[in-house]
């Protein structure tokens, strides 16, 4: 495909135009008085959202240079969303301000590389001040306040705080669509996986259609169990102990399954068989997790263990097991706390090292099942459009709350950046174009507060000047229009969100300023179709 090439100022200005179009569409959503954006979908109802990354993803520009500029800023929003779960609009607004100021200085003759170095040093200094000023989240109310701001709904904030309180910061909080109105919170004790009983004959509670085993042994087998002779030895040993048995295997086939069912129906031996969760290597890992949690071992020929020779000390134990048609829950496994902690550390290391979003999500689920718990927030709404929007807001707020617990909180409303900047620039000693680069950051960190003020119908310059003169931690509460102590008023941001927004915006701004050439695909003109669409090329069949 033919290419078109732009050089120097033309290249940078083309990229900036794309950035500005995208940023202008996103920044109207910033702050408590931000507006919504309607996104048309090829199929189904349109989506209404105030989430920066969702809006950014939908924007495709026609001009090739503008398109590249917009794609670069999408990366800012996407990266911030991945790391912190929020702050995508703030990151976009900061990127726009940094690029605007930076390009003005490049056009005036400043050295782009020195500007970039100055920006990086200033951002590092501001980040250091942000982290130093962060306050640890100590109460449920502080988590609720943070989540409420992200979701723009106090009820959602309170529910997320309750969920986090129950499952801990390592726990998984999932959001599901509900057919009812309102919000519901469902908590899961212990480890749950998505496989139920193989046969309904295992049910012990006919009304609830579930099998409940108290203080059972747990047999974990990596292969299929097809021959009843392989099982007889271990079954006899378990029966002698008068305990029940949960069998987790790739499958339990006809003969072996029939033996278990007959013993259960006759009341001789209570057991339940379920298929192992997952597939391939992921199944192996999950079985190993269950073994560590319950203090058992996976019976597998790979490690030289066979079902035929299995002994009771290879079995896991738990206080209780509940099995339904679709899922199995193991409550209070009898595993060694030290071994569980080691497994948790291993999974954490894998999360750090993986590049795949899907793998990361699955690893986090495994981590939660071992270290925390699982909470499900069920959201309902009157229409499908509203439901999608609400679900998305809750998902963002969950990640926002987790970020707050992780690194602490700072005053919200764009104030933390300005006040961290005041301290950071007092100590920063730079010269020449590096000092100019630092000054670009000094100007740009006002941008989020200015945009919040504009969206609230206030004069941005006046608001920024007023906030600069206020005590540390005080600022504009844009929801009420009052200048007050923001942390006390529950207006806060996770420092991870604010920090990530600034760092990612600066990273992209540096790329913009040091770009000298842009190579893009040449737009193809739409060639009109040839007249006469029949098989004889317009000859009417003759």
From Swiss-Prot:
Q: Name one GO cellular component term.
A: cytoplasm
Q: Which amino acid positions bind ATP, per UniProt?
A: 29-32, 86-90, 413, 477-479, 493
Reaction equation(s) it catalyzes: ATP + H2O + a folded polypeptide = ADP + phosphate + an unfolded polypeptide
The cross-references to Gene3D superfamilies, in alphabetical order and at most eight, read: GroEL, GroEL-like equatorial domain, TCP-1-like chaperonin intermediate domain
List the EC numbers from the record.
5.6.1.7
- Which GO terms fall under biological process for this protein? protein refolding
**Molecular function via GO:** ATP binding; ATP-dependent protein folding chaperone; isomerase activity; unfolded protein binding
Q: Family membership, please give it.
A: Belongs to the chaperonin (HSP60) family.
Q: Protein name, please?
A: Chaperonin GroEL 1
Which organism's genome codes for this protein?
Renibacterium salmoninarum (strain ATCC 33209 / DSM 20767 / JCM 11484 / NBRC 15589 / NCIMB 2235)
Q: Which gene encodes it?
A: groEL1
């Amino acid at each position: 495909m033919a290419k078109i090439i732009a050089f120097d100022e033309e290249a940078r200005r083309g990229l900036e135009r794309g950035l500005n179009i995208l940023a202008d569409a996103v920044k109207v959503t910033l702050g408590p008085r931000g507006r919504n954006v309607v996104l048309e979908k090829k199929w189904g109802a349109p989506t209404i959202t105030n989430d920066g990354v969702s809006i950014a993803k939908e924007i495709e520009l026609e001009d090739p240079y503008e398109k590249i500029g917009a794609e670069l800023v999408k990366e800012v929003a996407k990266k911030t969303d991945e790391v912190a779960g929020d702050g995508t609009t703030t990151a976009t607004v900061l990127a726009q301000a940094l690029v605007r100021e930076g390009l003005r200085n490049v056009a005036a003759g400043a050295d782009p590389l020195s500007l970039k170095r100055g920006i990086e040093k200033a951002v590092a200094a501001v980040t250091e001040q942000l982290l130093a000023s962060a306050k640890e989240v100590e109460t449920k109310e502080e988590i609720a306040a943070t989540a409420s701001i992200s979701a723009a709904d106090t009820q959602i904030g309170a529910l997320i705080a309750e969920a986090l309180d129950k499952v801990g910061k390592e726990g998984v909080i999932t959001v599901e669509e509900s057919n009812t109105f309102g919000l519901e919170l469902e908590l899961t004790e212990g480890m749950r996986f998505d496989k139920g009983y193989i046969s309904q004959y295992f049910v012990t509670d006919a009304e609830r259609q579930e099998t409940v085993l108290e203080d059972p042994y747990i047999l974990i087998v990596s292969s299929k169990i097809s021959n009843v002779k392989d099982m007889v030895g271990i079954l006899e040993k378990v029966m002698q102990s008068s305990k029940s048995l949960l069998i987790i295997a790739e499958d339990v086939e006809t003969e072996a399954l029939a033996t278990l069912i007959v013993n259960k129906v006759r009341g001789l031996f209570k057991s339940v068989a379920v298929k192992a969760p997952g597939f391939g290597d992921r199944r192996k890992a999950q079985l190993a997790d269950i073994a560590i949690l319950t203090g058992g071992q996976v019976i597998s020929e790979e490690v030289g263990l066979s079902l035929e020779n299995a002994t009771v000390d290879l079995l896991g134990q738990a206080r209780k097991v509940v099995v339904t048609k679709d899922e199995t829950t193991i409550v209070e496994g009898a595993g060694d706390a030290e071994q569980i902690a080691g497994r948790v550390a291993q999974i954490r290391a894998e999360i750090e090292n993986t590049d795949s979003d899907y793998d990361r999500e699955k690893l986090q689920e495994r981590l939660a099942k071992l270290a925390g718990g699982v909470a499900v927030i069920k959201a309902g709404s009157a229409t499908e459009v509203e439901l999608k929007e609400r679900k998305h807001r809750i998902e963002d707020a969950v990640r926002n709350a987790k970020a707050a617990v992780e690194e602490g909180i700072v005053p919200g409303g764009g104030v933390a950046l300005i006040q961290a900047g005041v301290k950071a620039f007092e100590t920063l000693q730079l010269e020449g174009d590096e000092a100019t680069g630092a000054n670009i950051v000094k100007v740009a960190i006002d941008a989020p507060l200015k945009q919040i003020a504009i969206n609230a119908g206030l004069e941005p310059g006046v608001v920024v000047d007023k906030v600069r003169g206020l005590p540390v931690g005080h600022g504009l509460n844009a929801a009420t229009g009052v200048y007050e102590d923001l942390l006390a008023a529950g207006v806060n941001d996770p420092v991870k969100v604010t920090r990530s927004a600034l760092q990612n915006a600066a990273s992209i701004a540096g790329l913009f300023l040091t770009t000298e050439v842009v190579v893009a695909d040449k737009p193809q003109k739409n060639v009109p179709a040839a007249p006469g669409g029949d098989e004889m090329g317009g000859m009417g069949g003759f």
